[in-house]
From Swiss-Prot:
Keywords: Amino-acid biosynthesis, Aromatic amino acid biosynthesis, Cytoplasm, Transferase. Belongs to the EPSP synthase family. 3-phosphoshikimate binds at residues 28-29, 33, 168-170, 316, 343. Monomer. It catalyses: 3-phosphoshikimate + phosphoenolpyruvate = 5-O-(1-carboxyvinyl)-3-phosphoshikimate + phosphate. This is 3-phosphoshikimate 1-carboxyvinyltransferase.
Length: 438
């Protein structure tokens, strides 16, 4: 069997407090939702500030395969999306959960057969929840995970379906995003443990409403754990995409762990992005956090304190928080994140193993991690083809000599050029502000 060798990136250590302004590209979660809605809309839409990364480019190519025209206008972050008749084809999902969970409902509306596949690692990710739901709504689908086939009939009946979305909020969002195009719309009822990452469902609902779609939720007087999308027209909407706040967390963490100061411009005052929770997390760990107009600035303390926190709704921040906790001066307890075992990798096991391999003291619990301060040393940090694992290693590397990150290029999934952006942040002398831009 041939052995694949992955390159190692020497994570730079901060020799002084980081002082920088870091401009981040658009949100992956918003970009891919906006692309789906634009593809199903009643006319052309323009998306400004869209993220161009592996995940979003996979979504763009998948929609083009299905018959949607997507063109760049000037900068490659401005996209003109023109709907067209949906057709069959072959879709590469890569490792993008949004592609493998948001596209099958669109494929069910196509006139033709759509074959889905992705990276080898993606074939282990659970998809039976959304595929079984689509079958219950009238779709013809072979398979329960990648690879699978959707035989589109040009329309989908829709109706009511009960699912267990405790593994991922994307199962709910995936059904809701296309539901206005179903003959009967859709009613999605969740039966199971609490749905994780609820802000992502809130994001989906808000964007649907901005597109003129009628949505009933538990928060607006609907049935508990139930979301209803009425059939109707998806209005074409031009959108300006917010910066990706989850990607910003690693750069803000750089200020926190070095006692420095990092500013991220264009931070929204109101947002459904889970990444916004980093403000309260860093504050609780001793950092100074200020939102001044559209600029968010974090100033790091002399020493971070530990934290006891339920991350259930913002689980994607766990790698950043775990890295912070590994460098804090007291124990931390990260709870409510058992669902992370089904992400790009088992993030709980991966974080525990990588921190412990550097001399750390991390224990897996039933639904999270307990992290006790310990002297860390250099070593190889595996990324597991997981972009957030790679950035977590970079955070640790700011304070620990000799951290070598395996396959840092996996960050291109949501933030291509991460290494250059990270290096630019660290490039000038302490006390001299520098600006890193995507």
């Amino acid at each position: 069997m041939e052995t694949v060798s992955l390159s190692l990136w020497n994570a730079p250590r901060a020799e002084a407090p980081v002082v920088a302004t870091v401009a981040l590209p658009g949100s992956k979660s918003i970009t891919n939702r906006a692309l789906i809605l634009a593809a199903l809309a009643d006319g052309p839409s323009t998306l400004t500030g869209a993220l161009r990364s592996r995940d979003t480019d996979l979504m763009i190519e998948a929609l083009r395969t299905l018959g949607i025209s997507i063109e760049t206008v000037g900068a490659d972050t401005t996209l003109r999306v023109t709907p067209g008749p949906l057709q069959g084809g072959a879709v590469d999902c890569g490792l993008a959960g949004t592609v493998m969970r948001f596209l099958p409902p669109v494929a069910a509306l196509a006139s033709g057969t759509v074959h889905f596949d992705g990276d080898e690692q993606a074939r282990t990710r659970p998809l039976d929840t959304i595929l079984d739901a689509l079958r219950g709504l009238g779709a013809d689908i072979d398979g329960a995970s990648l690879p699978f086939t959707v035989r589109g009939a040009g329309s989908l009946r829709g109706g009511r379906v009960t699912i267990d979305a405790s593994g991922s909020s994307q199962f709910v969002s995936g059904l809701l995003l296309s539901a206005a195009a179903f003959d009967e719309g859709v009613t999605v009822h969740h039966d199971g443990k609490t749905v994780p990452s609820m802000p992502h469902i809130d994001m989906t609902v808000e964007m649907l409403r901005e597109s003129g779609v009628e949505v009933t939720t538990p928060a607006t007087g609907g049935e508990a754990d139930t979301w209803r999308v009425s059939p109707g027209v998806v209005r074409a909407v031009d959108r300006a995409i917010e910066p990706d706040l989850s990607n910003a967390t690693a750069f803000l963490a750089a200020a926190a762990v070095t006692g420095g100061e990092v500013t991220v411009p264009l931070w929204p005052s109101r947002t459904t992005q889970p990444g916004d929770a980093i403000r309260e997390i860093l504050l609780a760990m001793g950092a100074d956090v200020r939102l001044d107009g559209a600029n968010l600035t974090v100033r790091g303390p002399q020493q971070l304190t530990g934290i006891d926190i339920d991350l259930h709704d913002v689980g994607e921040l766990t790698p950043t928080v775990a890295a912070l906790a590994a460098l804090a001066d007291g124990p931390s307890h990260l709870r409510g994140i058992a669902h992370l075992r089904g992400h790009e990798t088992d993030r709980l096991a991966a974080l525990a193993h990588e921190i412990n391999s550097l001399g750390g003291n991390v224990t897996e619990t039933e639904d999270g991690l307990t992290i006790v301060p310990a002297g860390l040393h250099g070593g190889t940090w595996r990324s597991y083809a997981d972009h957030r694992m790679a950035t977590a290693g970079a955070i640790v590397g700011l304070r620990v000599d000799g951290i070598r990150i395996e396959d840092v290029g996996t960050t291109a999934k949501t933030l291509p050029g991460f290494e250059n952006l990270w290096a630019t942040m660290l490039s000038a002398a302490a006390g001299t502000e520098r600006k890193a831009s995507f």
